[in-house]
Amino acid sequence: MLAVLPVLFGFFVMGFCDIVGISSDYAREAFGWSHTMAGFVPSMDFIWFLFFSIPVGIKMNAWGRKNTVMLSMAVTLVGMLIPLLKTDWACLVGYALLGIGNTILQVSLNPLLNNVVTDQKLLTSSLTAGQVVKAVSSFCGPFIMLFAVNVLGGGDKDNWYLAFPVLGAITLVSALWLYFTPIPHEKREDSGVTMGKVWGLLSDRTILLLFLGIFFVVGIDVATNFISSKVMIARLEWDTSTAGVSPQVKFI
């Protein structure tokens, strides 16, 4: 059962995508972005679910679940290093890679949990535990950003990007822990699933309604995480550091 620990820790890395909310406030000030440009940041992070989730899910049968999770960690780690170039385009590329890595991770991490939880009665509670770990990660995001600015950056808000190597170091620890943990391999086989067959499921009215429900709930979740700090800045005249804690009310 110890093999479940590095898999659950992977959910902590999964929560890093929620840092786009507070980090976009700092990026807007550092690069002189307009509010419209800053509003584009969540798209750079989450739009990749549309393009990569189904293809990765299909390819995962051939690659293997653990290998797919390791790929997601590698992409995420690269995305955490690129913002150190301290340019606006590097920041956007970093957000994009963070989104791609997170997409691959969300597709592959839940199935990998099946490989380490042998008792199917415990699978549901294990998945719930993973979401709790992800929520803790999202809750810690603003604190990590404040640590980067106030401790690593000497209180200079222009050093907000130092949060990324901190997150990158955590990602590296997670990847190494998982890599060196023996995990039983699932049987790999060609499932015969295609993009057309997957999209064809939406012809079922029940599946379509469930899909739309998830789509709108996730949209509200991302929008709340992103816009809450902006509302506090605009309406209550909070500074960026103080407003950054507002999304935590949702995650707590």
What are these regions (language model features)?
Residues 20-22, 204-251:
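Extracytoplasmic gate region of multi-pass secondary transporters
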Residues 40-58, 248-252:
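Central cavity-lining transmembrane alpha-helices of secondary-active solute carriers
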Residues 185-210:
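Juxtamembrane intracellular "pre-TM" segments in multi-pass secondary transporters
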